[in-house]
Amino acid sequence: MKALHAQRPSADRPSQARHPARPLLPLGALMLAGMSLGAHAQTAPATTLPTVTVQATEDAPQDGHRATATRVGKVLQDPHDIPQAVTTVTNTLMEEQQVGSLKEALRNVSGLSFNAAEGGRSGDNMNLRGFYTFGDMYLDGIRDTAQYNRETFNLEQIDVLRGSAAMLFGRGQAGGVINQVTKTPLLGNRGRITGSVGIDDYREVTGDFNKELGDTTALRLNVMKRDEGSWRSNPADGAEPEIHREGLGLSLVTGLYTDNELTFNHYTLKTRDNPDYGISFDPATKRPTKNFAADTFWGTNNTFDDSDTSMSSLVHQYKLSSQAEIRTQLRHASYERVYWAQAPNRTDAPSFDGSTGSPKVRQTDTENLTLQSDLTARTSLFGMKHELLAGIEYLKEDSSRRSLQDLDPGAGRFYRPGAFTSAPAITYQGDTLAFYAQDTIEFVPNWKLTLGARHDSLDAEYSSLNSPQLDFSESSIRTGLSWHPTATTHYYISYSDSFSPTADLYQLSGGSFPAERSKVTELGAKWMLMEGDLALRAALYRADKEWERNTDLESTAAILTKKRRTDGLELEVAGRVTPNWEVFSGFSLMDAEILEIAPGADARLEGQRPRNTPKLTFNLWSTYALGGGWKIGGGVEAKSDRYAYVPTAANANSNFIDGKFSPNTAPGYARWDAMLAYEQKSWAARLNVKNIFDRVYYDAVYDQGGFAIPGTGRAIILTGEYKF
């Protein structure tokens, strides 16, 4: 069978093989005028961990559960070599689990929890290591922070770089960044069509087609259409929190496998969902209410969540020599979203006209223009090996939001896109210019020192009268010391920081506060076993955040906490244990605490665990090839309980019972899934069962404390695949 996932030299996912080759490292084209850099080929000693190589053959194997390459560190390299914790969700893993949305894929990431609604941030919204990631979503290394629900049909893998990463990506948080890696063209002609059906009206069709147009030119097209019902419904009118999504990803490359490569990418995604705001908390029990069954839905047949996303990119890669490359990306992105959701009611049952529950309405339009250019090179200086990176980035952001007008003059409610209240739109314009540089120095054999710095200048302006024009000029650093005693062992200690101004969140507060700062120290180890087929990692970290910003657009508070901390332990294993047995698993322990409360907040909140930060998370997915084309698999995703409360409250009596801190709490859970597959050269069939035991669990919480969203009930999905 011709593998649709064969890789090309400049792709973000090289082959499974681990053989010595030259890595390509990042400066911007705009900084290169009049500058030249000599690069000299170096032969790594046998004890130095070899960098990845790339197979250019049509039938190169795709990654299994272990990713062999990533560009999340701005350099195409094996995740094993990065002095920072990295989790990669591969395409194979997503296919085996029948993953459609980014949210479902990220269930494979330990230490990650899901937020619900967030007062307007009802798109993809997660916490990593207890810190929000709203401003840390990326697509091929470029910011993708708009509010929408992302899909995986056009993704090759998802890289999660843990810890502060502002030196590499710009303003951000302590938890880390989530970088989506898109599929790219290959040489050769091949394709795949997949169709899936399941209970609760699940229907999905995807297509992945690659066409060779010339010796160095190729086109790749990915398409998707999915419809889903739900196990939950409104008893008054039968409405369900439905999903209706369709998308297209197109990529054309010329100069493939040459020193001068140009790629054009275009991506569109349309969603027409009925949003789900879950179940209210009971003020007496501090748990999701039992007054209504967990399958009760407060939305109606008229509520909606419509979004249209469009992105066009040009990527130019030019090899200055065998040891130096410049890579430039230009992207225009447009995001349009409008929704009406009904938040649940603690005492009143759902109605057909929206008269019960609380309406959440908003229309947002965002337009981003990004230019990013990186120069990477390898050279020797004073007898030491250097891996150099330098870059420049310009980002222009333009966003507006408005509230919708209730068109029903009676007791019910009715909203429609484009029907606004008389209040003017709230707008945000921001211009960011950044310069960054990094050097990884092998100063003695097997020891490497990474030193990096970045400076961001942000000029932002709000239309809100009590929001001044904001100018921020901040620097970030990244350091790491690595020891490679063998080619398969890596021990490191790293330190990084990051910043995020109010402007980053579009929270529109008129208050004047210092920029949010995060500092992360991490001690880690990475091992490669089974001749490189199995990767293990362990990390101990401390993450501190000061002047933590509020991300809830419904709230007027700007600061959540003055200082908070998470101390954590992470363990992860990914890859092949035997030729037939693969595994992907992660375990996370988090000890989180509010060290200093927000100005004016209740002093009793100091020392408490922050919101939506479970003490423990665990995920496991494992498959075994039985022979004759048969494969079985299964796994579990588990989280301990998560708090939901307002940390800015001046009087937090509702969170204390007899002096004991007792906020609203989403209970811990464990969800078990299973898979059975039969694979042949040109076709395959797969049966997935999600939530085998049909447990009611709450996988997302609105961290202000209002409600929690139940996870999927038992889902049975049958998939057929044709490959040619």
Give the residues covered by each predicted segment.
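Acidic, small-polar-rich N-terminal luminal/periplasmic segments of exported/outer-membrane proteins
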Residues: L49-G188, S498, L523, D703
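Transmembrane beta-barrel wall of Gram-negative outer-membrane proteins
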Residues: R190, V197-E228, R232-N274, F304-V315
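Structural signature of Gram-negative outer-membrane beta-barrels, strongest in the C-terminal barrel
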Residues: G255-D259, T366, K385-E387, E393-E397, ...
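Surface-exposed loop/turn segments flanking beta-strands in extracellular/periplasmic regions
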Residues: F281-T296, T347-S355, R401-I426, N550-T561, ...
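Face-selective signature of the C-terminal outer-membrane beta-barrel domain
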Residues: S310-Y335, G357-S463
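Membrane-embedded beta-barrel scaffold of Gram-negative outer-membrane proteins
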Residues: S313-R331, Y335-A343, H484, Y491-Y492, ...
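Gram-negative outer-membrane beta-barrel transporters
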Residues: R542-D544, L560-N651, F693, T719-K723
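C-terminal beta-signal and adjacent terminal beta-strands/loops
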Residues: G628, A638-N653, A677-F724
